[in-house]
Amino acid sequence: MKVRMYNVGFGDCFCLRDRKKSLLVDFGTNNSRIEGRPRREIFDVIISDLSTINRKNLLLTHFHMDHLSGLLYMMKNRDSSLDFGKIYLPDVFSKEEMSRTLVLLLLADLLKESGLPSRQVSLFALVDALLENRQNLELLSRGKIFEDKYQALWPDTDVIQRETDEVYNEICKNENLAAVMEELLNFAEKLRRIIWSMTEEGKAQTEKEQEKISLAYVYDREFRRIKAIPEFKELLSFLNTNKVNLRQFKHKISIVFQNARDGELNLLFTGDVQPGHLKMIAENYDGKLPLYEHYWCIKVPHHGTQEHYFDFSQYEPENMMISNGIHFANSKKESKELRTSPLYGGLFYIPDTHMYCSNCDCCDCYENGCSCKEADVISPAYYKDI
């Protein structure tokens, strides 16, 4: 068993490789260039590497472009040798009421602080790509065992639904926005049904239900129609003015998983999980899935940024991975917020832990050299095996 950590700058891409089957965890970046190389060159190197693996599945922790842009690139330049047996997604698709969450995810990419071009909506881009290249999908939520050896610790569908309803109902209190929110809800339900139709449970739908799914261009046209509604601009203005932080909803649904059985090579992958949710997981809030006492490898949440900092010292990790990189944000304040937290190194370094980082230029622990006693920086290489 080994973990291959790819250098994708401010993004995530890991491959859990063993002799029987491999699992790619996320595949994307926010950077247009990495180590001076165009990101498509990095993607091509990773794709070439993956093509040597016969049996492989993919897990997308959530729907930010820094986690899925490589997958979209791969699907656009389709090659049968790159097929995944299965793609795992967070479960925000199995029930009709989850369409409310999808509405918030769609809106998140259209707000000013989204960091994405207005035409690029990551959830819609993923559904669009899946319509063109249908895949076998499986939805993960707390307690679900997958690959016969891993178990999802998050998302908890009940918690997500509760947090969704709080925000969604608050928006709908504005009577001027009720009609456009209903339009978005109907559209989101169509997207939900598309994803659901690619799961084992969804494939059992009646032929009549399957026939309702249209070609990709039909949904693109409908989404453009909704965005052209005058009330839609009013909705975005309302969300921006009232600083409704929908971007965090993509973090709220992020998959967190560990080994299904306690052993010597315990893994903990945290995606971009929200700090409050990670605290709940660590405290075993429902008494069902405790974290283990010791981990061989922990993937630090959200590129090691200060806002998502978590103290893993009690778990005595042998290895910790921080997929960091320079993030060229719209402001100096935002760029600083996306640097690697100093609490992962220096005086706060966890003894006997080996740190693996993509890049040291964005780390607040790095001045005249790395402050971690045991560390490997992947840059300028393409990947590092752990």
Please describe what each predicted stretch is:
Residues M1, G9-F10, D262-G263, V273-Y292, ...:
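C-terminal regulatory/interaction regions
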Residues M1-I53, F249-K279:
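Conserved beta-strand hairpin/beta-sheet module of binuclear metal-dependent hydrolase folds
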Residues R4-Y6, L23, L59, Y88, ...:
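Hydrophobic/aromatic beta-strand patches that form the interior of the parallel beta-sheet core
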Residues F10-D12, N31-R33, F63-S69, S94-E97, ...:
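Active-site environment of divalent metal-dependent phosphoester hydrolases
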Residues I34, K243-V244, F257-V300, Q306-D311:
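Long, well-ordered mid-to-C-terminal structural blocks that present hydrophobic/aromatic surfaces
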Residues I34-L89, G287-E307, E318:
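Active-site metal-binding motif and surrounding structural segment of the metallo-beta-lactamase
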Residues I42-F43, R100-L110, L123-L130, E283-Y285, ...:
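Short, aromatic/basic amphipathic alpha-helical patches
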Residues N77-N266, T353-I386:
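Flexible, acidic/histidine-containing loops and adjacent segments that form or flank the divalent-metal
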